[in-house]
Amino acid sequence: FWFFGHPEVYILILPGFGMISHIVAYYSGKNEPFGYMGMVWAMMAIGLLGFIVWAHHMYTVGMDVDTRAYFTSATMIIAIPTGVKVFSWLATLHGGAIKWETPMLWALGFIFLFTVGGLTGIILANSSLDIMLHDTYYVVAHFHYVLSMGAVFAIMGGFVHWFPLFSGYTLHSTWTKIHFGVMF
């Protein structure tokens, strides 16, 4: 199952990355995100690395120590391109005239939740700790922070940002900010 099912979770978040990059650049008054080519390479690396880390879901099935060491290392390497993305989003914000509109709040919420989820992922990448944390709410929190809430926040940010373009109607600013506050 994890051999084909695991790459899916890394591929599912890629459209969210694109939406967050657009929103952060737009509401920072920038033409493009900081380190555009680094962001492209980071997304490609995340997509490819997702195919070689699948067994980190199977540490408890009796793998030998060398195999666990490989998958621990390979899983931790994913932190590098994701760190590049988070750094680039924050660098895009730096020095910009930030417009504190609702899509930007969703994007900042995404960056925060994705970072917290990434930190929990680094801890879970360690096979020794993962065995201790197996079947706990720590694992549930990790994937909800990264994928569930990450994807939801990216989709909501994209929806609020592009809805006026697609429909010709503007969403009420106060109510959308209240909606963000309730969700966060």
Curated annotation (Swiss-Prot):
Record field: transmembrane: 1-27, 36-52, 65-93, 102-123, 137-166, 173-184
Major localization listed first in the record, in broad terms: mitochondrion
Membrane topology: Multi-pass membrane protein
EC number(s) given by UniProt: 7.1.1.9
Entry binding sites for Cu cation: H6, H56, H57
GO molecular function, one term: heme binding
Crosslink (1'-histidyl-3'-tyrosine (His-Tyr)) position: H6-Y10
InterPro entries: Cyt_c_oxase-like_su1_dom, Cyt_c_oxase-like_su1_sf, Cyt_C_Oxase_1, Cyt_c_Oxase_su1_BS
Cofactor requirement: heme; Cu cation
Family assignment from sequence similarity: Belongs to the heme-copper respiratory oxidase family.
Function: Component of the cytochrome c oxidase, the last enzyme in the mitochondrial electron transport chain which drives oxidative phosphorylation. The respiratory chain contains 3 multisubunit complexes succinate dehydrogenase (complex II, CII), ubiquinol-cytochrome c oxidoreductase (cytochrome b-c1 complex, complex III, CIII) and cytochrome c oxidase (complex IV, CIV), that cooperate to transfer electrons derived from NADH and succinate to molecular oxygen, creating an electrochemical gradient over the inner membrane that drives transmembrane transport and the ATP synthase.
Name of this protein: Cytochrome c oxidase subunit 1
Organism field: Polypterus sp.
Primary gene name: mt-co1
